[in-house]
Design a protein with these regions (language model features):
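Short amphipathic alpha-helical segments and helix-helix/interface helices
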Residues: 50-51, 110-114, 137-144
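Catalytic His-Asp segment of secreted/periplasmic serine-dependent ester chemistry enzymes
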Residues: 129-180
Length: 180
């Protein structure tokens, strides 16, 4: 009988050690990501939807703004992301380019990326919806310094031919892309 008790106690100890070993192998949860979004009318539409999906999130968007406005800090872009330094985002989503016309300036894109990298943020550029014909897509594809790009949504466009009918599906695509 004493031997059975010893075996039972020994087995319990081994199982307990195994549980402790498994628990210590689990990855520690990363601190919540701070995510920001800056941009044009797409940011205006995406911001409220992404705020539902990302706990530590802030955004600024201004209809009709271009990379030139943001890169050169013009009045058109309001604060132009001045709040980003205090917010200290890990990742900044940039939704700009569709308003740049037929000859986007790579220098404006690079200035934005360098400025955001300079505050310690990874930059993920959000391309315009796939059905929107824009020269900015090639410029975005050629950028260095990005953590990544989110290709344009294939969601149906509104009658204006530029904006999605609904921003929720696009926001979910973006949130999934940056969580990997």
């Amino acid at each position: 009988m004493g031997r059975l008790v010893a075996i039972a106690i020994g087995s319990t100890a081994v199982v307990a050690l195994g549980v402790i070993a498994l628990a210590s192998r689990r990855p520690k949860s990363a601190p919540p990501k701070r995510v920001a979004l800056i941009g044009d009318s797409y940011a205006v539409g995406l911001g409220p939807e992404l705020a539902k999906l990302i706990p530590d999130f802030k955004y600024e968007g201004h209809v009709g703004t271009s990379t030139s406005a943001w890169a050169n800090h013009t009045a058109a872009c309001g604060q132009c992301g001045d709040w980003l330094t205090a917010f200290k985002p890990n990742t900044v989503l940039v939704s700009l380019g569709v308003n740049d016309g037929s000859a986007p300036s790579i220098a404006n894109y690079q200035r934005i990326v360098q400025g955001l990298n300079g505050i310690g943020a990874d930059v993920v550029w959000i391309e315009p919806p796939a059905a929107v014909n824009t020269q900015s897509r090639n410029t975005i594809a050629s950028l260095g310094g990005l953590r990544g790009r989110v290709t344009g949504t294939r969601a149906p466009l509104s009658p204006d031919g530029l904006h999605p009918q609904q921003y929720g599906p696009w926001a979910r695509e973006i949130a999934a892309a940056i969580s990997t």
